[in-house]
C-alpha cells in the first residue's frame, strides 16, 4: 500500500458537538490533505454521516446537570482526568499505527502530549487557555491540571484560537470558525419547509439542555404567537415534545440557523459563532456553573437568570433585524495548517 503524503490525524474533543463542527469547516478547506478524525459520541456520528474517515474511540464523561445547573464539578474533573489518561493510551496507539506526520487537536490534550513526546508537529485549536470549574479545596487539583495544560500549550507548534485579537508567541487568533452553506436563506427555508416565523431551539450534543427546551417551549406557547417551533435535540435526548417539529440530530445545524428567525440555545461557542455569522437573532442561556458557557453568554449580554424572562426576550429578538457577519476563520486556520504539510 502506498503511504499517503501528509497523513494527518485530527483529534476532535467529543464533549459536545461544537468542536467537530468547526473542525469540519477547517477540513473543508484542506482538500489536499488526507485527514483521519479521532473522536467519539455524537461528534463521531456526524463525521460518519458526512463520510469522513473517523476512529470512533473516545468515550467522554458526561456533565451532571439538573435544572440547568452543573453539579459535582469536582467529580467531573476527576472523571475527566481518568478519561484523559485513557485517551493518551488510545491516541498513542493510533498515532504510531498511522505513522502520523501531523497531529491537529481540537481541545484533546492527550494526543498533543503523545505528539510532543514523539516529536511530531502538533497544532492545537482551542478557545480555552485555562479551566475554572471548581472552587475551594478541590481547585488545587484543577490548578495542577491547568499547569500541565499550559505546558502542553506552550510546546505546541501553533495554537489557533477562534476569536478576534492579538497574536502572541505561538498563539494565532483568527476570528470565528464557521461552516459555510452553498444555499441562499430563501432556498434553505424552502428546503426545510419553513413557512411561518421560525424559532429554533438548539441544545448541542449532550442531555444538559433539557431544561432549556422545556422552558423555551412553555414561554413560546404562552406568548400565543403564529410561529413554528423547530427543535434540534442532538444525539443524547430522546424525550418527545408536543407542539414542536423535532429534527432530532442533524449534521447541518448552521443551515437551519440561517433559515430560522430566532435561535434559542445553550451558550456553546460554535453555535454562538454560527448564529452571529449568519445574522440570526439569538438568545443564549448558559449551564449555570459551566464557566465557559457563562463567559460566552456574558459576552452576548445574557446570563442564566434570563431563563426566567424568556417571553420578554423572545418578543424583543423577533423584532430585531438580521445582521450577517463575514468570517473567514476556517480559511485562515487551513492556511496555518498547510504550512506544516510538505
Identify the function of each model-found stretch:
Residues 1-228, 236-342:
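Nucleotide-activated sugar donor-binding and catalytic core shared by glycosyltransferases
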Amino acid at each position: 500500500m502506498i503511504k499517503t503524503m501528509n497523513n494527518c490525524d485530527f483529534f476532535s474533543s467529543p464533549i459536545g458537538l461544537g468542536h467537530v463542527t468547526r473542525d469540519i469547516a477547517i477540513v473543508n478547506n484542506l482538500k489536499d490533505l488526507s485527514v483521519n478524525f479521532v473522536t467519539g459520541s455524537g461528534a463521531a456520528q456526524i463525521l460518519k454521516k458526512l463520510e469522513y474517515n473517523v476512529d470512533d474511540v473516545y468515550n467522554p464523561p458526561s456533565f451532571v446537570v439538573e435544572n440547568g445547573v452543573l453539579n459535582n464539578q469536582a467529580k467531573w474533573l476527576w472523571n475527566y482526568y481518568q478519561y484523559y489518561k485513557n485517551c493518551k493510551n488510545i491516541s498513542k496507539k493510533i498515532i504510531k499505527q498511522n505513522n502520523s506526520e501531523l497531529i491537529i487537536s481540537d481541545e484533546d490534550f492527550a494526543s498533543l502530549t503523545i505528539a510532543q513526546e514523539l516529536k511530531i508537529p502538533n497544532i492545537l485549536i482551542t478557545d480555552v487557555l485555562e479551566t475554572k470549574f471548581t472552587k475551594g479545596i478541590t481547585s488545587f487539583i484543577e490548578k495542577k491540571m491547568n499547569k500541565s495544560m499550559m505546558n502542553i500549550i506552550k510546546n505546541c507548534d501553533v495554537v489557533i484560537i477562534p476569536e478576534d485579537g492579538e497574536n502572541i508567541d505561538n498563539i494565532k487568533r483568527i476570528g470565528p470558525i464557521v461552516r459555510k452553506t452553498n444555499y441562499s436563506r430563501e432556498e434553505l427555508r424552502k428546503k426545510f419547509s419553513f413557512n411561518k416565523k421560525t424559532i429554533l431551539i438548539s441544545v448541542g450534543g449532550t442531555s444538559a439542555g433539557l431544561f432549556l427546551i422545556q422552558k423555551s417551549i412553555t414561554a413560546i406557547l404562552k406568548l400565543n404567537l403564529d410561529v413554528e417551533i423547530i427543535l434540534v435535540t442532538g444525539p443524547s435526548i430522546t424525550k418527545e415534545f408536543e407542539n414542536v417539529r423535532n429534527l432530532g440530530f442533524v449534521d447541518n445545524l448552521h443551515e437551519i440557523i440561517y433559515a430560522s428567525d430566532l435561535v434559542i440555545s445553550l451558550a456553546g461557542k460554535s453555535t454562538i459563532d454560527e448564529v452571529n455569522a449568519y445574522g440570526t437573532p439569538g438568545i443564549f442561556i448558559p449551564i449555570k456553573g459551566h464557566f465557559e458557557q457563562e463567559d460566552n453568554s456574558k459576552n452576548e449580554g445574557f446570563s442564566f437568570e434570563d431563563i426566567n424572562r424568556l417571553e420578554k426576550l423572545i418578543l424583543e429578538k423577533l423584532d430585531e433585524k438580521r445582521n450577517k457577519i463575514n468570517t473567514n476563520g476556517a480559511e485562515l486556520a487551513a492556511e496555518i495548517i498547510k504550512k506544516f504539510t510538505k
